[in-house]
Amino acid sequence: MILEIRLSNFFSIKDEVVLDMQAASIQTKKAKELEENTFVCGDERLLKTVAIYGANASGKSSVIKAIRACVGMIFSSHNYNENTIFAFTPFKFGGIGKPSTFLIRFLLEGIEYEYSFELNKVEILKEALYYYPNGRRSLVFSRDETKGPDKKNIYEFRSVIRRPMDVAANTSKKTLFVSRASQMDRDTAKDVFRYFNERFILNYFGYNSFSVERLLNENKEQFLNVLRIADSDIVKIDSRHENKVFSTAVIDPADNQILSVEDIQKPQLVITTYHRNNPDVPFNFFAEESDGTQRLFNMMLTILDIVKNNKILLIDEIETQLHIKLVEYIIGLFNKSESAQLIYTTHNTYLLNTNKLRKDQIYFVNKRDDGSSDLYSLFDYKDFRDGLDAEKAYLQGRFDAIPYIDEQTDNFIK
């Protein structure tokens, strides 16, 4: 689970910003009432959800995009070649040519890890992994490409990873050592890689048909509840697999000519829905339900899987195409989960409610005079007491992070 993320020189982020998922020590009645929004992992109490507010073009999305870019590199950098250009943009007003940095602290099997790397658009410059097996910081490996070209000077290892120099010899400046070491079956690196690959959900995604059927059957009542919140009149939903006959051509590889056409059977998922007004009339879900209902279905598959399996979801503009009550329900699912974590951006001030979110769960992004983004928490405002109206204070500009609107519209209208 995430303890902390630090970023610098990504997109509109210039100076280092910190997203802290460790619950602050808030000794108030309201914080105690919202204790279910936190969970204990090891010796740490962590937040389940964090909301990021800010004006348009303030840089809210930059936080999500930067995390996605860095985690995506961990997933796939072992496949990069010498022509790869990394999928991010440094801060354009002074950040071009300077390194970008990413650091994450997380808990894996109750042990704290600290992983970081530094890079520019075309190569990895530094990388390091530490862990705390007995509560004390211990090096797994460090890498500094400025000390090259000799790999023995670039890398420093402890005795955690098996034959590490074999991995280093196969790690180019385009590749993260963790990615390569995992690919080469090194245990500690595999554990770290698996953490990012299995725990971090960077966006909504698809499932195979058997997983869809399983998730639907396991969560049918919750699906129907979500549909009710979305003002759907669906009252029943069933699923099954049917064998469908498909025709397939047999091709002669020698001349690419069709030799024959064969019928084959494949299992196909069939989802049937029933509506309030005519509960005996079946509807083919994929053919007859609306695009919006199908999008909601796919999204909720992801969310229910994440919540049940204690994964981590990043969402930019969580309210997009969703009713605000449904968004509130989704956030509530995470806050009621065992240890799932949700990081999301939003414009909707209806959700800015300190009766439902702790002060350390609310972050703001504000654009500085130089165009860069600053990230800070409502918890930083020590004079903001429980019981005050956070939405009203935000709209009045008390926390900045709102757009400047010139109310003199006469010239614009003319």
Per-region residue spans from a language model:
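C-terminal lobe/lid and adjacent interdomain/linker elements of RecA-like ASCE P-loop ATPase modules
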Residues: 4, 329-414
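Conserved P-loop NTP-binding catalytic core
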Residues: 35-51, 55, 64-124
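Pre-Walker A-like glycine/lysine-rich segment at the N-terminus of P-loop NTPase domains
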Residues: 2-69
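Conserved catalytic network of the ASCE P-loop NTPase/AAA+ motor domain
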Residues: 96-97, 108-110, 304-307, 334-338, ...
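Electropositive, glycine-dotted interaction segments
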Residues: 114-246
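Conserved Walker B
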Residues: 10, 317-322, 349
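Short alpha-helix of the ABC ATPase nucleotide-binding domain corresponding to the H-loop/switch region
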Residues: 323-328
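Conserved ABC ATPase signature
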Residues: 49-53, 253-304, 312, 318-322
